């Protein structure tokens, strides 16, 4: 019931912020990490992309929950199934509302954990257990690339805050025809310019998305 209400409220937010021209805003939650140059406070970022994803996550999750009430009615472990499903929804919401890359990574890994638990829900079956372990391991390969991409962004922009990164990204590269300003990132023994560093970081972030969305070559867990 609460998830249906959340889905309806997501549509309200979509029409007000996404289509209504409402301004993006941030809702502070708590102070999280402060260590040297690294500052990552827990906050909810609400902008056009966020409200679109809130509609997708909450609407689809509400429909899945409603369908599962009948589909799982015979299973004696139904409470555990709905706990895993709710954990998956929570992790997805944490991911899409994150205000910084550290918070996003927590949601990202939460989705991976919930996927592992759901895939291996009927753990008595060897095939289900094997599929869950395979999915977990393959996704960790992609997540390693994603984590390296986060480290790279912190080195390039000096922040993990999404607002700061978005604001500086447009002016990060030198103007057309201007000379490069030295080494921006050392990666695997290579001294990368700003343009090359951004390309490598984007590929590392994409590597994480490849694992989560089962794209070649990190697709082998999906058929199982």
What are these regions (language model features)?
Residues 1-224:
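...captures the hydrophobic TM-helix bundle architecture rather than a specific catalytic motif
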């Amino acid at each position: 019931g609460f998830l249906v209400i959340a889905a309806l409220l997501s549509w309200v937010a979509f029409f007000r912020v996404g289509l209504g021209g409402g301004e993006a805003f941030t809702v502070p939650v708590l102070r999280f990490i402060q260590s040297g140059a690294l500052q990552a406070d827990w906050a909810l970022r609400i902008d056009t992309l966020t409200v679109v994803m809130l509609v997708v996550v909450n609407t689809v999750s509400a429909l899945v929950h409603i369908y599962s009430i009948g589909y799982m009615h015979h299973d004696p472990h139904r409470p555990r199934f709905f706990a895993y499903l709710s954990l998956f929804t929570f992790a997805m919401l944490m991911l899409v509302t994150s205000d910084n890359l550290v918070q996003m990574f927590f949601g990202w890994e939460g989705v991976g954990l919930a996927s592992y638990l759901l895939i291996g829900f009927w753990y008595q079956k060897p095939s289900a257990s094997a599929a869950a372990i395979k999915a977990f391991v393959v996704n960790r390969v992609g997540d390693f690339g994603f984590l390296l991409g986060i480290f790279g962004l912190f080195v390039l922009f000096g922040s993990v805050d999404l607002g700061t990164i978005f604001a500086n990204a447009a002016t990060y590269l030198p103007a057309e025809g201007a000379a490069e300003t030295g080494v921006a990132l050392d990666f695997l023994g290579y001294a990368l310019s700003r343009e090359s560093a951004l390309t490598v970081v984007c590929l590392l972030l994409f590597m994480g998305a490849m694992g989560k969305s089962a794209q070649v070559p990190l697709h082998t867990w999906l058929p199982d």
